[in-house]
Amino acid sequence: MQPILDWEKNELNTTGLGLIPMVIESSGRGERAYDIYSRLLRERIIFLVGPVTETSANLVIAQLLFLESENSEKDISLYINSPGGLVTAGLAVYDTMQFIKPDVSTLCIGQAASMGALLLTAGAKGKRYCLPNSRVMIHQPLGGFQGQASDIEIHAKEILALKGRLNEILAKHTSQTIRTIEKDTDRDNFLGAEAAVKYSLVDAVLTSRKVKHE
């Protein structure tokens, strides 16, 4: 699945340059340094930033399971800024979100496109949010295959089956009909924050921090 916009092909890779901010905490036992994402994980905040890949999906899944083991009653917050990605990887995250006991609250920051949009709307009902200038995009799965005619037919059937399953998931979490979902995902369908609320992809637009993460 393709990103919404790709302004810079040679985007600065801050991870590779070691520019992830570090947080120093002092206690009676001395000082301890955390990278910023690990520190936020202590507050039960998980980030899904960038394409949904096997690697990023596995990291999110591991963090979800870890936070459930730490406290199975407290909500988990999943912040999403993603252009989408692998369907199977995204569905693995989706299944884990539904499987674990804590509610997973989702928040779109920037964009939630394709599989990112599905994960956004898969958050706990009443706890799905986006920021005012966020963009959400839904569409049908993309795919391509080369080979013998019989193999192409097999893969075409699989893509259609995935399309049907993704439509069912969107219908379940938005309360839209399957027919409506099929029509609205036939092509790339972009929605602003308020439109995403009207479509029931999210429950509210947050303009300031009104929801305290426990």
Curated annotation (Swiss-Prot):
UniProt catalytic activity: Hydrolysis of proteins to small peptides in the presence of ATP and magnesium. alpha-casein is the usual test substrate. In the absence of ATP, only oligopeptides shorter than five residues are hydrolyzed (such as succinyl-Leu-Tyr-|-NHMec, and Leu-Tyr-Leu-|-Tyr-Trp, in which cleavage of the -Tyr-|-Leu- and -Tyr-|-Trp bonds also occurs)
Source taxon at top rank: Bacteria
Coiled-coil regions, chain positions: none
Subcellular location: Cytoplasm
Short name of any one Pfam family annotated for the protein: CLP_protease
GO cellular component, one term: cytoplasm
EC assignment: 3.4.21.92
Keywords linked to the UniProt accession: Cytoplasm, Hydrolase, Protease, Serine protease
GO molecular function, one term: serine-type endopeptidase activity
Active-site positions on this chain: 114 (nucleophile), 139
Biological process per Gene Ontology, one example term: protein quality control for misfolded or incompletely synthesized proteins
Function recorded in the entry: Cleaves peptides in various proteins in a process that requires ATP hydrolysis. Has a chymotrypsin-like activity. Plays a major role in the degradation of misfolded proteins.
Quaternary structure (record): Fourteen ClpP subunits assemble into 2 heptameric rings which stack back to back to give a disk-like structure with a central cavity, resembling the structure of eukaryotic proteasomes.
Protein family membership: Belongs to the peptidase S14 family.
Alphabetical list of NCBIfam families matching this protein: clpP, PRK00277.1, PRK12553.1
Protein name (database record): ATP-dependent Clp protease proteolytic subunit
Lineage: Bacteria, Pseudomonadati, Pseudomonadota, Betaproteobacteria, Nitrosomonadales
